[in-house]
Amino acid sequence: MVAKAYYFKGEYIEAKKTLDFIKNKYKKTEIAFESELWIAKCYIALEDYNFAESILDELRAKKRFPDKLNKELLLTFADLYIKQEVFSDALDELKSACNLIKRKSKKARYYYIIAQIYQDAGNSKQSKKYFELVLDANPEYDMVFNAKMNLARTLRTKKDLNQMKEKLLKMIKDEKNKDYLDQIYYTLGEMNIIEKDTTTAVENYSLSTKHSVENDIQKSLSFLQLGQIYYKKSEYPTSKIFYDSAYTFMPEIHQFYENTKETKEILEKLV
């Protein structure tokens, strides 16, 4: 469909024009309903959330709305709520969408989003549950890897932490993970922090920086963690070195950039 091509190129106004034409030409047909759904997506992309929600509400209320489009309607609602940061409603829509998907492998992506929402909310129990569902769905390796890294951060009991550390250490030896070593060592460092073992955390964060060749964001986060550890110890000269490095590698659009910059400037005055 030409309209979808416009949409995926980011040309939302052109996409909406085409979709409006289709909706009006083929009224009360399945393609008309689908066009309205994509018009709502365009409004979401344009950040006109109120108008997008009004379209979606109207579609949900229509008795003739095709069953085969229900999953996409739920996922579009979820996207809208995530953009608005109404995460409780987003979770409801995502879970309902998962109930309509039969193949586990197709559910993996949405389980992952659900897990991330719970993780960001600090709900380790539910986050752990959904990251485990991601792994159970046996998706592509990149998602498996990221789910394992995030799952490790949800663990709290000594038994769970030790079991996961064993798995991560095995992953380090696996050739297919050679490009992910920076993330594995970083995750080990995160687990060390949970255990209040800052000495080992420093070792793992340092290894993360050494193995981070092309991933500047990961490198910056590892340096940032090192900077924070030494800052809390009041070892300001050492902390400054790591904050300088974190600031150097961190892109300006990163959520931690401004805070990193401020702390770096404070350390410049202290040292």
Named regions from a protein language model:
Residues M1-V271:
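Acidic, polar-rich low-complexity tracts and alpha-helical solenoid repeat scaffolds
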